[in-house]
């Protein structure tokens, strides 16, 4: 299966982000959040992730009303080793700091508990 159609779709989506995607990208790009490298509109399998940190296998989705309940997509991504965080556009607009804190907490390496 060719990945060319997904790459073209991802490229088009990078050119026309929503306001909320642009706000989130501004906060994630250039390793601004905890030093983690995020990519935007990245093809993963048959899907295009809004944002992904490949190092932590973490996907962040900024969702409007039509994408928030996408269980099949999330199940496929999780089955392939990714964690998926979803935020509504309203959550991003009203509380970007809270969204970034949740992303940072999910991206941070898990520490073993001391005995």
PLM region spans:
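Solvent-exposed, charged helical/coil patches
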Residues: 1-36, 79, 91-94, 107-115
């Amino acid at each position: 299966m060719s990945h060319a159609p997904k790459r073209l779709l991802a490229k088009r989506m990078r050119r026309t982000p929503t306001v909320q995607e642009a706000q989130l990208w501004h906060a994630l790009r250039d390793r601004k959040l905890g030093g983690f490298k995020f990519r935007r509109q990245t093809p993963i399998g048959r899907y295009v992730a809004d944002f992904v940190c490949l190092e932590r296998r973490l996907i962040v989705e900024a969702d409007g009303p039509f994408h928030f309940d996408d269980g099949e997509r999330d199940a496929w991504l999780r089955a392939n080793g990714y964690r998926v965080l979803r935020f509504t556009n309203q959550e991003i607009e009203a509380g970007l700091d809270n969204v970034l804190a949740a992303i940072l907490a999910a991206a941070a390496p898990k520490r073993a508990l001391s005995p």
